[in-house]
Amino acid sequence: MRFLAPLLALLLLGGCAQLNAFKDLAGAITDKIQGSDNAEPPKELQPLEPTVNMSVLWTTQVGKGSLGRILNLMPAVTATTVYAADHKGAVVAVERASGDVQWSKDTGLEIASGPVVAGDKLLFGTSNAELVAISLADGALIWKTALTSEMMSLPRVSHNLVIARTSDGRIAAFDLGHGGIKWSHERTLPPLSIRSQGSPTLHGDLVLDGFGAGKLIALNLQDGHLVWEATAVVPRGRSEVERMVELDADAMVQGDVVYATGFQGGLSAIDLRNGSILWHQKTAYTSHATALSRKSLFITDTNSDIWSMDITNGADQWKQDVLHQRRLTVPTRVKDYLVVGDFEGYLHLLRADNGSLVGRLELSGEDPIVATPLAFEDVLYVLTSDGLLAAV
């Protein structure tokens, strides 16, 4: 899994233990997350004659990037403008067509997630347990709301409500206009849990979110009451590590089906109407988001192998391991292709129907691409860990 050492530093241990016991547990989790081949080096890139060419349209610098931290910084795009931020609070608005900077603002925030466009506002979560809204026009502060703990997930917006998940397991709704709290849902985290960057999924009047013990919940958007709870995977095993099951990836919805995956959680299809399990497969899992097409679901697993699975039953359609252990991003769909970034600053283009590699672009020399590339009108917007924002 990407960023293993920082993830281990973020483990939540209930009741806890002596230091030596913690070290043993951390070592076991290291092996479990990275897999039995954790010492295996990333595959070297082989010569490629591209059949589809990618080129850089423009680049600009966004502060200092993530400063080596595990954050959820991603570009946000509108019809005219691309917005991005760094961890130390630098926010820039860039003209989408030319890459010219329209405005920049030093907010002073320790930004952990965002930005997300919501009407005339940009929304962020911070490492200092804040949900913040600034002006889309010039970056001026509109409101700031205190949370119960840091916010690693992206804010979600629907019906004038901002849904925020914090790392202590709470989900809360806030008024988009002034930041006042509307409701809060608290859940009990399992004794051992990995702090997740996954974000709630909003669909109709439901808030969908996965967490430990293999559970996915649906809350009512307006008042936060529990509509249903599904146990997609029953934790099994003799050790605490073997029993860790986190549905921590963003849930995906198509029709009346929600697809959920996460650490040691396999992939599950769940009936959106009542939470019943339609099917479950154990072949692959990811702690990051997935991509959907009409017939397939695409994931980058913990070994950076890319899978295509049938959305009707979870059957494998293809697997691509040519980029094994290259710390890939979540796949992004662009027409008939998938795009992933890697730890050396390369973008890779694959055919969605068979997984074959058809294009490659070195975006920035050895500067990792960790944020999911964002596609808008056949242009990709990519933010590297050092703060390079590029249109491709």
Regions found by a protein language model. Name each.
Residues 30-59, 226:
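Blade/loop signatures of beta-propeller domains
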Residues 20-29, 51-76, 103-118, 141-158, ...:
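Extracytoplasmic beta-rich repeat domains
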Residues 89, 129-130, 169, 214, ...:
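Short coil/turn segments within WD40 beta-propeller repeats
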Residues 95-98, 135-138, 175-179, 221-224, ...:
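Short loop/turn segments that connect beta-strands within beta-propeller blades
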Residues 13-15:
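C-terminal motif of bacterial Sec signal peptides marking the signal peptidase cleavage site
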Residues 86, 126-127, 166, 211-212, ...:
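Structural signature of WD-repeat beta-propellers
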